[in-house]
Structures are given as C-alpha cells and as structure tokens.
Amino acid sequence: MTHAFDMALPATLTHAQATAVAQQLQKTLLSAKETCVLDASALQQFDSSALAVLLGACRTAAQQKLRLQIIGLPKRAMQLAMLYGVSEILAGHSSLPPSP
C-alpha cells in the first residue's frame, strides 16, 4: 500500500516565509512512508529562497528514501532554477522535463 502525503506550497514563498515552510515540509517528509506529492501550483511570488526550500525537500526525501513528486511548479520557478544551475535536481522530482 502506498502512503502519499500531500503538501502544498503557499502563494508567496520568499526569504520571510522560507524557514517556516521548510520546517513544515521537513516535518511532513520525516513522517512520510513512501511517496510524497508537493503541489507548487499556488506559488506566485517567490525568490531564490523558494528554490532552497525545494532543494531541501529533495534532500530530505532522498535521505529518507522517499519518492518526492513536485507538481505544478511554475515555469518562472524552473527558469530561476536553470539560472542557478539546479534545474536538473528539481526536474528529477517534477513533472517538467529537464533543461536541454
């Protein structure tokens, strides 16, 4: 039986919200069993702190041997990830293809 823990990012995820969101995601991931789905579709206002939160979630999932799927990641967030050179990491967890 697969246990999916659905999580959602807020509409705004900047430096001001990053610590609280990261702590909540980590808490949820640490209590998960197999698969976690992270819905990023509400994300509208964000900065590089959002990438740090997402990368932290990917790292925690890997450490816990969980499958993390990021859905609804806005195109602008993936473009920012490409700018910082981390798009391949996020693409491995999202429904978006990796950069060419």
Model-based region annotation:
Residues 1-46, 56-100:
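STAS-like cytosolic regulatory interaction modules
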